[in-house]
A protein has these predicted regions:
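Bacterial N-terminal signal peptides that target proteins for export
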Residues: 1-9
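Bacterial Sec-pathway N-terminal export signals of envelope proteins
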Residues: 21-67, 220-260, 312, 341, ...
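Sec/SRP-type N-terminal targeting helices
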Residues: 44-48, 61, 90, 104-132, ...
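Small/polar, glycine/serine/threonine/aspartate-rich low-complexity segments that form flexible
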Residues: 69-102, 226-234, 267, 280-311, ...
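Bacterial N-terminal signal peptides
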Residues: 9-18
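Short flexible linkers and secondary-structure junctions
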Residues: 24-145, 277, 281, 317-320
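Short segments within alpha-helical structural elements
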Residues: 193-220, 370-427
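Periplasmic alpha-helical coiled-coil/stalk elements that build and connect Gram-negative outer-membrane
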Residues: 2, 134-246, 351-354, 358, ...
Length: 430
């Protein structure tokens, strides 16, 4: 009786927890994604990097530099001789100027620099998209994992209720002398095993909620419930997925952008072969005053302008070395793109195989779970009537529980594969 009371206590706690969860707000997957996108720290850091790249895109390479100078200097010279008293001669000097320097040609380097800044901005924006996709993938995976674990828990609750009913029935039959004490003890062992299993599964569900809440970064005290059903999208076509992956996969887009930056780096180095032409102009003012002489001063002022050209005719083959290295970097970026493309397309094929297999297995296991449920209902009735032993009933019970768990596992794997395919095809943020 003590074991029965213990199992009833466990069942009451779990049912109370289930009722509390039902009373909480249901958090949809879309709401969870929005919460994560708003609060995730890694995404905030990536967005700040994007703002830095935005600040770096300026017209500075095309614009002149303007500088201004000003100066005031006072000089005191003391003159003395044997025939006169010492005298102090003071001079005051004032000068000011403004200059403008403008590079008007540098082998088109300024245009390449600006274009490179824009490309780096595009890459930063692409990294934000990748971070968003990664976060959405994690949120979806954890969300559906909670659904699976909760369904595991529900099936464990059902199994515990059946084991409790079996034990009570076995105890009554034992008191009537219908069964032996050995069968009663076996029923008690199975009841205890199901009690332990349900407590372990309840801990698994709680841990899944904690991991999910950490991912949302919404505070561990956040209370919510989630939906209890996993729905697979209509079956996807592999040819369509291949085409979309090559065009829209964000990792491949980032690799293509990196290749373009390498090309621009090569263009910048090539610009070193050309002369640079600068235009400069300015205005200078200078005034020197002699206070000891009335109305005595010297003043100059005026404009200046001119052009200046610099051409590095020979640099000890440094320019040639830099161009050679830039070409190698460009080749490396092209090879890196091909490597990433090969890796991603290979992952696509593997995921699609897992996806199709997961759908097929899910259909099989769904049918098996329904058959197992029907068989369990029949077995329960036969057990109550005494035409089925406790050990035989336990086998039906385990078959039902295993069928439910296999169905949930297959459904979860198919859904995770579906999410992975949408990620590779660039569809996850649509």
């Amino acid at each position: 009786m003590r074991k029965i009371r213990h199992s009833l206590t466990i069942l009451f706690i779990l049912l109370a927890a289930s009722s509390a969860m039902e009373a909480q707000k249901t958090l949809t997957l879309d709401e969870a994604i929005m919460e994560a996108l708003e609060n995730n720290y890694s995404l905030k850091i990536t967005r700040n990097d994007l703002k830095i790249s935005e600040n770096n895109v300026t017209l500075a390479p095309f614009l002149p530099t303007v500088t201004g100078t000003g100066r005031q200097q006072q000089t005191d010279n003391t003159t003395s001789s044997s025939s006169s008293d010492p005298s102090v001669n003071r001079t005051n000097q004032y000068s000011a100027g403004a200059s403008l320097n403008w590079r008007i040609f540098d082998g088109l380097g300024m245009f390449t620099t600006y274009s490179r800044q824009e490309q780096l901005l595009d890459m930063s924006n692409q990294r934000v998209k990748i971070e968003v996709e990664t976060l959405i993938t994690r949120v979806c995976t954890e969300y559906y994992n909670i659904i699976v674990q909760q369904n595991y828990l529900e099936s464990s609750v059902t199994s515990l209720a059946l084991s409790r009913s079996r034990y009570e029935n076995a105890e009554e039959k034992y008191l009537l002398g219908v069964i032996s004490g050995l069968e009663l003890q076996q029923a008690k062992i199975d009841l205890n095993a199901d009690s332990s299993e349900i407590l372990s599964q309840y801990e698994t569900v709680n841990n899944a909620y904690i991991r999910f809440t950490k991912l949302l970064n919404a505070g561990l005290q956040m209370t919510f419930n989630i939906q209890d059903t996993i729905i697979l999208a209509p079956e996807m076509n592999i040819d369509s997925l291949r085409g979309r992956t090559v065009r829209y996969n964000n990792q491949l887009i980032l690799a293509r952008q990196g290749e373009m930056v390498s090309q621009q780096d090569l263009d910048l180095v090539r610009a070193l072969r050309y002369p640079t032409v600068n235009f400069s102009t300015g205005y200078n003012y200078n005034r020197l005053q002699y206070p000891w002489e009335a109305n005595s001063y010297n003043q100059t002022n005026g404009f200046n302008w001119g052009f200046n050209m610099t051409w590095n005719i020979f640099t000890g083959f440094e320019t040639k070395r830099k161009i050679s290295n830039a070409r190698l970097e460009l080749e490396n970026s092209r090879l890196a793109y091909q490597d990433i493309e090969n890796e991603i397309l290979g992952d696509l094929e593997l995921l699609y195989n897992a996806y199709i297999n997961g759908i097929t297995v899910t259909n099989f296991e769904t049918e098996s779970a329904e058959v197992a449920r029907t068989s369990l209902e029949i077995a329960m009735e036969r057990y109550r009537l005494g035409s089925l032993s406790g050990l035989e009933f336990r086998e039906y019970q385990n078959n039902y529980l295993n069928a439910i768990n296999r169905k949930l596992t297959a459904l979860y794997r198919a859904k995770v594969s579906e999410i992975g395919l949408r990620l590779l095809a660039g569809e996850l943020t649509e």
